[in-house]
Amino acid sequence: MWLKDPDKIYSIINKVQSVLDIPLTVKMRTGWSDPSLAVENALAAEAAGVSALAMHGRTREQMYTGHADLETLHKVAQALTKIPFIANGDIRTVQDAKQRIEEVGADAVMIGRAAMGNPYLFNQINHYFETGEILPDLTFEDKMKIAYEHLKRLIDLKGEHIAVREFRGLAPHYLRGTSGAAKLRGAISQASTLAEIEELIQLKA
C-alpha cells in the first residue's frame, strides 16, 4: 500500500539508506491502482537517497495484464535528474530495449520474464548498444544447447532429482515459438532423469 503514499516511500528508503554502507537501489511499479503518483513516488525515492530507480510499467492491480505504460515511464524518466532510471516491463526484443532508451528516456533496462527461455537476449541487447548491430535469433539447436547447459548447472546446484523437476517448468519457455513444441513439452514434463531429457533433446555431455 506504500505506493499510495510518497511520504511513506521516503521514510522507508531513508531509514534503510541510513544504515547501509553500500548503494541502495529500488524497484517499484507505476502505482497501486493507477499511475497518478508515479512521478511523485519516484522523486520521493530519489530524495531519500537511492542510487538508482527501476520502475515496471504497470500498476500493482494490473499484475501482468495489459501493456507497460510507456507514457508514465517517460514522465518518470524526465522527472529524475540525479539518479539513473531503469525501465522494466514488456522488453522482449532489442527493439523494445532501444525504444526504452531512445523514446522513453531510460538510462538502462531491466529484463524479467522475457529472459526465461531466452537468456541470449541480454547478449543481443548488449551487442546492439555496443556496435549498433542486431544479432540474429538463435536456432532451435542453439536454444536446446543453452537449455541443456541450464539444466546441467541446476543439477550441480540442487541435485538431479530437484533440478529435473524444476527444468520441466522451464522447458516451455525455451520451446516457445518452436514447431512441434507441444509434443516435446509434453514429453519433457514426464521426464524424471537427466538421461531422459538428453534423449528427448538429443544432446549428450
What are these regions (language model features)?
Residues 26-38:
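Active-site mouth loops of central-metabolism enzymes
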Residues 23-28, 54-58:
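Short beta-strands and strand-loop turn motifs
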Residues 1, 29-30, 61, 85-86:
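A generic structural signal for short
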Residues 1-3, 55-65:
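Glycine-rich, proline-tolerant flexible connector loops at the mouths of alpha/beta enzymes
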Residues 7-8, 29-32, 58-60:
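Short acidic/polar capping segments at secondary-structure boundaries
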Residues 7, 11-14, 19-21, 35-52, ...:
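Alpha/beta catalytic cores of nucleotide-metabolism and tRNA/nucleoside-modifying enzymes
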